[in-house]
């Protein structure tokens, strides 16, 4: 059953400016080591900004779906893709619900949509 939803949109040039100004300091505050490592496959700053903007949107969308950011940091939330490219979101804290994630980008914007589902043991 759907428990909650969250969505977010990020202006990619803003992330690019932040990357240019703060670099690793910004990345290390928001993203996991794995997310940062996976971004290195992109050769241009613009592609890295697009990659990080989608992940930032996903993290924000999850916090909105959860209803509160208390007790969780952006680094507790990790976004990765399976071998076919489907995005997934995991949370390092105990979180037993199923999380569905959709990411998209077009032009200057990246978006994310999160659905949190809970499964009842009563049928």
From Swiss-Prot:
GO biological process, one term: fatty acid biosynthetic process
GO molecular function: holo-[acyl-carrier-protein] synthase activity; magnesium ion binding
EC code(s) of this entry: 2.7.8.7
Keyword annotations of the record: Cytoplasm, Fatty acid biosynthesis, Fatty acid metabolism, Lipid biosynthesis, Lipid metabolism, Magnesium, Metal-binding, Transferase
Binding of Mg(2+), residues: 8, 60
Compartment list: Cytoplasm
UniProt keyword annotation of Cell inner membrane present: no
Claim: Metal-binding is one of the keywords in the record: yes
Ranges annotated as spanning the membrane: none
Catalysed conversion reaction: apo-[ACP] + CoA = holo-[ACP] + adenosine 3',5'-bisphosphate + H(+)
Cofactors demanded by this protein: Mg(2+)
Origin superkingdom: Bacteria
Main location (coarse class): cytoplasm
GO cellular component, one term: cytoplasm
Record's function text: Transfers the 4'-phosphopantetheine moiety from coenzyme A to a Ser of acyl-carrier-protein.
Family per record: Belongs to the P-Pant transferase superfamily. AcpS family.
Name of the molecule in the record: Holo-[acyl-carrier-protein] synthase
Species of provenance: Wolbachia pipientis wMel
Name of the gene this protein is made from: acpS
